[in-house]
Amino acid sequence: MARIKKRGTTGNAKNFITRTQAIKKLQISLADFRRLCIFKGIYPREPRNKKKANKGSTAPVTFYYSKDIQYLLHEPVLDKFRQHKTFAKKLQKALGRGEVSDAYKLDQHRPKYTLNHIIKERYPTFADALRDLDDPLNMLFLFANMPATDKVSAKVVSEAEKLCNQWLAYVAKERCLKKVFVSIKGVYYQATVKGQEIRWLIPYKFPTNIPTDVDFRIMLTFLEFYSTLVHFVLYKLYNEAGLIYPPIIEKSIGLSGYVLQDKDAPLKKKEEKNDEEGKNLSKKELNKAIKADQEQQENDEQDNNNGESVEDIELDEFTSTKEDSLLQPSKYASSTAELFSKFIFYIGREVPLDILEFCILSCGGKIISEIAIDDLKINDPEAYKKLNLSNITHQIIDRPKILQKVPGRTYVQPQWVFDSINKQELINVNEYAAGETLPPHLSPWGDAGGYDPNKEVEKEDGEAEEDTDEEEEEVEIEDGDEDQEDEEEEEDEDLKAQKELELEAAGVKFSEINEEDKKSHSKKSKGTSNKEADEEKELKKIMMSNKQKKLFKKMQYGIEKKENREKQLTKKKKQLNKKKEQLKKLN
């Protein structure tokens, strides 16, 4: 006889473990367990049968895979957490006894851990790290915009801000930016780095109200892991681009405060110094060299006079042809990389400088801001007088009227920059002039429901009549049965014959009558084809199982919902277009 298996030794009971059991097994606190799970990427699992997994109990419990918890037992960070626990006890005892010097010594030898090995485990290739960079960047930009509080220290905020600026500096330098979208939440950017599309959100720099119900301990744990990952990625990117990491920080604000130096720059400086040292020779050495050259020339002339006369031979002249020279490819592959390379932008004080600065620099443009000129006027008046502003091609403003226009400048609103980047070409400036009503700023990633307003505009004019005809056909087909339709067709033929006789008597051409017949015939053929398709659907439904029918109903519900939404949006658009036309007529 086979042995009877004990209950709870196989299946779900063995594969899953509860959170309390996992904490007991690892011998750490709940807070440390959460931190460890975040670092290692372990998350709760949902067993198919909770009752079996919980050994008969139906109480609400969080489950994890037993193998994941077994994997955590050998983690070096776990050992550091235990060391920190003993360190905290010793420090508390020393402070309780009043031994300040001992407490200070203990604090200096505080156990520290690194997440480098975890980053290498979770992201074996660089492409994996880049693919997972969306969430880390969103988190870093969120904390960079937050004020320092008792929960979030100023050090954390400054570190997040530094990493964000380093990332933006790299994207601007390598010109990786592809898409921009200004929304209510903030500004969405998309860049292509090493073939991977990375999208992140930068919130607006408004005073933020920090909610009380947010657990900042968990968020700070995620931030700790993400900042380590971004450090790794930036180091690799800067090295591959031949730039020094971390970049040198200047006192000036914005991206211009990060000077990106090449690694070869110090070597070039050394070579230049060596050349200068070679040039600074003494006068005596130079005179000796000149005398030696003169003596050599005299000897050569004597040899030429003593030698036999040689016939003068005309040598062929080889001229360099431009046809042989090949066009070198551009350093930047994307079409947006050199979009604004020929332009210099003057940004007014009413426009958000940080957003436009990043966008324009990423597309090869140059910037002069009104705020920087005002600072220069106060701090260095002599440099301000020498400043040349005649090279400015575009001025970005966000005001309804301009009192004084500078000749030679093109005045545009900020949206022109964003729309030009999204369309990857320079858009006509007339629609974006000062005081003009701007066109809608659409998302470059499209609508989640599949609605595309640009396509609808193309279809609106030509297909408006066809849509109404199709609606009438559907109404006609739905009424009546097949027998009634046959009778109607016979009646229609009699009516046609009568109409033809009447039209001939009135003097109408036969070709015009044929055209009308063709239109009516096409309508009927469309109606019959739709009916056949519906019949096929019904037959297919009959062959389906109950499970498949339910799934099909859900699918149809989703499709109908999308279609209704599209219809509502198109109706709204038509109404808006009509109102615009009426206003134009009135004006």
Swiss-Prot record:
Annotated Pfam families: BRCT_2, Pescadillo_N
Key words of the record: Coiled coil, Nucleus, Ribosome biogenesis, rRNA processing
Biased composition (Acidic residues): 295-311, 459-494
Regions annotated as coiled coil: 267-306, 470-587
Transmembrane regions listed in the UniProt entry: none
Location of the region described as Disordered in the Swiss-Prot/TrEMBL record: 290-311, 437-587
Swiss-Prot/TrEMBL GO biological process terms: cellular response to starvation; filamentous growth; maturation of 5.8S rRNA from tricistronic rRNA transcript (SSU-rRNA, 5.8S rRNA, LSU-rRNA); maturation of LSU-rRNA from tricistronic rRNA transcript (SSU-rRNA, 5.8S rRNA, LSU-rRNA); maturation of SSU-rRNA from tricistronic rRNA transcript (SSU-rRNA, 5.8S rRNA, LSU-rRNA); negative regulation of filamentous growth
Family from the record: Belongs to the pescadillo family.
Complex formation: Component of the NOP7 complex, composed of ERB1, NOP7 and YTM1. The complex is held together by ERB1, which interacts with NOP7 via its N-terminal domain and with YTM1 via a high-affinity interaction between the seven-bladed beta-propeller domains of the 2 proteins. The NOP7 complex associates with the 66S pre-ribosome.
UniProt-recorded name of the protein: Pescadillo homolog
